[in-house]
Amino acid sequence: MSSGRGPRIPEYWYGQVPVPPFMRFMEVIYAGAVSLRRLAYRRGWRRRYGVAVPVVVIGNLVAGGTGKTPLTIEIVARLREAGWTPGIASRGYGRRDPKTPRWIQPDTPIELAGDEPAMIAWKTGMRVRVDVDRSAAARALVAEGCDIVVCDDGLQHYRLMRDIEIEVIDGQRRYGNGHLLPAGPLREPMVRGRLCDFRVLNAGQYSDRPTSGFGPGDWQMRLHIDHVQSLQGSRRRSLDAFSGQRVHAVAGIAHPERFFAMLRQRGIGVVPHAFPDHHFYRAEDFTFGSRLPVLMTDKDAVKCRAFADDWFFSVPLRVELPTAFWTALFDRLERLVSC
């Protein structure tokens, strides 16, 4: 039985429910503000800042999660393998004192880091800088020796000039009802996606070739789970070890039911506990009434390490994209540095 603490999304965003008239009115105001802001950057009325190294921005057009952070982590890992020294810029959503720029280490207190920057630092071991001004974060990373900046989220942060834009799309929900906030989930009009260099569809059916779309095409990404990692120590176990068992499954992410479904597909008996996205956990949150293993996403695990016991396990997501996607991405980077 779910804890019922997950986020509430308006039914009209993704369902067949009519949009309330007041929300349509507010959408018109929001659309005007978005258009004026873009015009200000395009005409030079608002200044943009660049850095002397390639900048890759990974983001989305809709409010809420689409799988950006797992893709960010995978891209950083691939860049390292190719000899780059990537640095990651992030806003650090939900952290205390959000206006203070900060370097994030794997052991930075979660309330100072924000959950996603903390997870990126933990999983990559690379430099992570949080700053509401991502252009300032990029400059700080370059000053520390990074030769490429990867921006986790920030598609709408036009203050930072970028070389490559990657839009991540929920392959199931796509753009919902197609309306802008607050009438729908869109931060910007759908046409904005045509300007991105790559579009990655999360949870779409896997293909080794791009589907019809813009630029290099719509690349389809799959997320896999195959092992668990103890939050205490380095003990790693196959996920099959929990097949046929009941576990407490914890997810404080945009779409917790997808994590629960992935576990069920592996034959695991799931007792689901959905929390709001970006929820900061306390030990009291895990008073479930039954002593079972606790399986959670990496994004949740990074916030539970301080009080976790031997029954707590993270379930890392493994990102799978076509080989041709990586070839196209690195070809683009090579062209940038050779100019």
UniProtKB/Swiss-Prot annotation:
What GO molecular function annotations does the UniProt record carry, in alphabetical order?
ATP binding; tetraacyldisaccharide 4'-kinase activity
The catalysed reaction is: a lipid A disaccharide + ATP = a lipid IVA + ADP + H(+)
Q: Which InterPro entries match?
A: LpxK (IPR003758), P-loop_NTPase (IPR027417)
Q: Which UniProt keywords apply?
A: ATP-binding, Kinase, Lipid A biosynthesis, Lipid biosynthesis, Lipid metabolism, Nucleotide-binding, Transferase
Give any Gene Ontology cellular component. Answer: plasma membrane
Q: What is its EC number?
A: 2.7.1.130
Q: In which pathway does it act?
A: Glycolipid biosynthesis; lipid IV(A) biosynthesis; lipid IV(A) from (3R)-3-hydroxytetradecanoyl-[acyl-carrier-protein] and UDP-N-acetyl-alpha-D-glucosamine: step 6/6
Q: Which GO terms describe its biological process?
A: lipid A biosynthetic process; lipopolysaccharide core region biosynthetic process
Task: Identify the enzyme class.
Answer: transferase
Among its keywords, does the record have Lipid metabolism? yes
User: Which superkingdom does the taxonomy of this entry point to?
Assistant: Bacteria
Q: What does this protein do?
A: Transfers the gamma-phosphate of ATP to the 4'-position of a tetraacyldisaccharide 1-phosphate intermediate (termed DS-1-P) to form tetraacyldisaccharide 1,4'-bis-phosphate (lipid IVA).
UniProt similarity note: Belongs to the LpxK family.
Name-wise, this protein is Tetraacyldisaccharide 4'-kinase
